[in-house]
């Protein structure tokens, strides 16, 4: 048991690591208020084509967007950079993605705060994915501020979550927790914020609070294998091995063959069989 405890406390599942652009950020189109009707329709059609091309051939979409960016201006150029950044993200070209999203933000009118927030968040996320935590924070702070100004709570929460990830990378755990408090306040219905909060609290050894957060995540996303994995880790660290076993076994049912299932299988093997678990719990003093 002590070996498992040490292993899980140090490692465990880590949804706090740098991530990829959230689909709600990528797919939500920026405003085109300055584009006349006919041109707006053409712009919209081009953007749909470019996004469809990303799914089929991201390298070709990347080239299409580069050409479009170089040949256009105004709203057309903003949307070309949007697609360019998304294609670059799909290809793992994080610096290209960051540059494109920053350009899209800088060319978006100041009064279109929601679009500017989105592009800043995407730039920050690209920086995070490349391992540049400081660079990520540079863009995630204005992303959150602009999203709040636009009354876009979900978008502000996403920026706060990525800011928390960046702060964890910089070993600034308490600041990261503040960011996650903001995220769960802004978007209490999103399970991801509660999962990240539970994971960070567990790593800070604040296990009672971690349990509360993971229970909330489980209510919001009962079918999320990452939630089940984290719930099991918190359970074993608080001496509830039977509960940990149940959580990890649920991961095998929810997502067989997934990375989470592979991790759960490894944890279950370390835990031993059910009879050994029951015997250990009977021998343990009440908490």
Model-inferred region functions:
Residues 90, 122, 129, 162, ...:
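Register position in tetratricopeptide repeats
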Residues 83, 122, 155, 162, ...:
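Canonical tetratricopeptide repeat
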Residues 23, 245-287:
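Terminal, low-structured helical/coil segments at or just beyond the last alpha-helical repeat
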Residues 50-51, 86, 125, 165, ...:
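Residue-level recognition of tetratricopeptide repeat
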Residues 5-83, 276-287:
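N-terminal leader/linker segments that initiate helical-solenoid repeat arrays
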Residues 43, 78, 117, 154-157, ...:
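Helix-start (N-cap) detector for alpha-helical repeat units in TPR-like alpha-solenoids
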